[in-house]
Curated annotation (Swiss-Prot):
CDD domains registered for this protein in UniProt: RRF
Protein purpose: Responsible for the release of ribosomes from messenger RNA at the termination of protein biosynthesis. May increase the efficiency of translation by recycling ribosomes from one round of translation to another.
Species assigned in the record: Paracoccus denitrificans (strain Pd 1222)
A Pfam family it matches: RRF
Family assignment from sequence similarity: Belongs to the RRF family.
Protein name per the record: Ribosome-recycling factor
Amino acid sequence: MSDEIEIDTDDLERRMKGAMESLRHEFASLRTGRASASMVEPIMVDAYGSPTPINQIGTVNVPEPRMVTINIWDKGLVGKAEKAIRESGLGINPQLNGTIIMLPIPELNEERRRELTRVAAQYAEHARVAIRNVRRDGMDQIKKAKSSGMSEDDQKFWEGAVQELTDKMIASVDQALEAKQAEIMQV
């Protein structure tokens, strides 16, 4: 293996892990019937003239398995936060208690559970595509290096390394999807 031509597999791995992290974030936003502070992370509230994440205008807590509470720090933003939650598409009806917004998480019916597993599968497929795109970029780097004088043995080595990394990341996507689907279908 020649020292002068090397493929940056660390960069490829970092980009693939970024796709995996994005998948974890998308999975966290799925409402599975269990309360979690990450459910409300994507909700933006029109606060002080600009969209602000709800967790930056109040404290998000999970006091019970089926309850999320948000203690809004500024009384003037309680109504806007409640409106943002209603319009978020979470399907949760917020209840007000002073500056505290309570979000009771209802049980999911079978149809909704199946729908959420399909959504989770779509998220996983997007992550797989992103990982394959990174793989393609790596293979393109190898082709450029081959035209710059990389030996055929080195080319095979780097192609194998990139493919091995891709297979490992795709397997972790599949594993995360299995775990998420099991969590969603659990009654």
